[in-house]
Amino acid sequence: MTTREYDYIICGAGSAGNVLATRLTEDPNVTVLLLEAGGPDYRFDFRTQMPAALAYPLQGRRYNWAYETDPEPHMDNRRMECGRGKGLGGSSLINGMCYIRGNALDYDNWSTHKGLENWTYLDCLPYFKKAETRDVGPNDYHGGDGPVSVTTSKPGVNPLFEAMVDAGVQAGYPRTDDLNGYQQEGFGPMDRTVTPKGRRASTARGYLDQAKGRPNLEIVTHALADRILFDGKRASGVTYLRGSERANAHARREVLVCSGAIASPQLLQRSGVGPGAWLKELDIPIVLDLPGVGQNLQDHLEMYIQYECKEPVSLYPALKWWNQPKIGLEWMLNGTGLGASNHFEAGGFIRTRDDDPWPNIQYHFLPVAINYNGSNAIEMHGFQAHVGSMRSPSRGRVKLRSRDPNAHPSILFNYMAEALDWREFRDAIRATREIMRQPALDRYRGRELNPGADCKSDKELDTFVRSRAETAFHPSCSCKMGYDDMAVVDEEGRVHGLEGLRVVDASIMPIITTGNLNAPTIMIAEKIADKIRGRQPLARVDVPYFVANGAMARNVAKAVRQPETV
């Protein structure tokens, strides 16, 4: 078996791996091998390229690892879905395309952890801007010439978007024109990773398209990383599988693990890096007993609050097969129409209590009543709010089941394990009902479909959450940055106690961010790419940003309709 040599080997061509591959190969003297277990991002496949088709990749296994959790003890012992992207682009190939960076205080909070002082919001903002091309042009908060195409919401797409935002404001919450700008808190339009031609802006399209022709980058698809190879405590390469064939690759400088919050700890554990007791159970030779690998797993849990729509303005007709050819043809020929949007064009972030320092609840508004994965569509005109808490105190874990790289690991998010989780979800349902009963929605709002108007008491709300809440597909934090006993990597993604090995993806977040994770993951990779290259970090951007400082979470005096008593 021959062993080829590269300066860097990247395991995983997802939101982070494609950034690293592109930035590292800007130096023509550096060679990079990019390994991806999935296939290409076929540009002719509408399932991944059409924004409106976002549910399709989650329904099969061509583009989705289709993980399932162990029975979740606080969720009626349900085995819950944990979809992760497979193919060039990783989860940016199958996600909802919502471009949300997180709250400024997420990063300021990270920076209070020992050793993470350079992860403040103002340190991270230059890398958000570097990655982005926003369709309305750059400003103090946004970039204009980055690899990721970001499309802003346009007025008049669907009257339900504006009505739902107006309802949030009428309920006493702020209005914000930019969820990624000065103030995340409030309701407003939502940016999306969609190209000007109406195509999904995955990192394969944005980053790899500019790098894949470089002679110093080799991309190998259908290549499943089996183990990281070590020479003592130094990572020296990777052994991987292509079908039934095994190949080895040697890394002169570093191995970069970018396989995501599920597969990165799985690969480390399979390679002998992780909790020693777990490795001994599978007779894996221990390279380093690192207890935090696979621990601290976090996610966002969400539920769908659904209503009948009294006027025929929802997307319900677009779900019918006889209307879809016309929608698809317009999208294919012109890049316009219903097919060119993910239809998450409005949303918001709120605090449910005045003492919450920054938003603890996120909303995605959708002008149809359907599950995120395309299942359980309501057979009528409807609309819904996806709502969930942002910083659950519950923690889970990813644990290896088998030395076989094709075997899925044991995953337990441990959703809703803490009392605060239940309080926040009850608050979220009641806040959503207050928003939905505002005058802006009077002409559209019919009966409440889910959870249903009769679901009112704490016990009834808890039963609904336990039986119906689903993942928002934001696993993270399972190889966290930091310097405490459970930290896995340092502030530059270098694995503690080893040489030549980094983890760079959403797994290294110490605490999950407020919102969707694609944009923060790209930022993390951009920031660490400069560290790997030995470059000076981009200068901090000195801009103001909103801090609540104990301000009222909701201005009840300005609310048009007061909450109902129950």
Swiss-Prot record:
Keyword Oxidoreductase: yes
One of the record's GO cellular component terms: membrane
Pathway(s): Amine and polyamine biosynthesis; betaine biosynthesis via choline pathway; betaine aldehyde from choline (cytochrome c reductase route): step 1/1
Reactions performed catalytically: choline + A = betaine aldehyde + AH2; betaine aldehyde + NAD(+) + H2O = glycine betaine + NADH + 2 H(+)
Enzyme class: oxidoreductase
SUPFAM superfamilies noted in UniProt: FAD-linked reductases, C-terminal domain, FAD/NAD(P)-binding domain
Residues annotated to bind FAD: 7-36
Database matches in Pfam families: GMC_oxred_C, GMC_oxred_N
Biological process (GO), any one: glycine betaine biosynthetic process from choline
Name of this protein: Oxygen-dependent choline dehydrogenase
Region entry Disordered, spans: 180-203
Positions of the catalytic residues: 474
Family: Belongs to the GMC oxidoreductase family.
Lineage: superkingdom: Bacteria
Cofactor: FAD
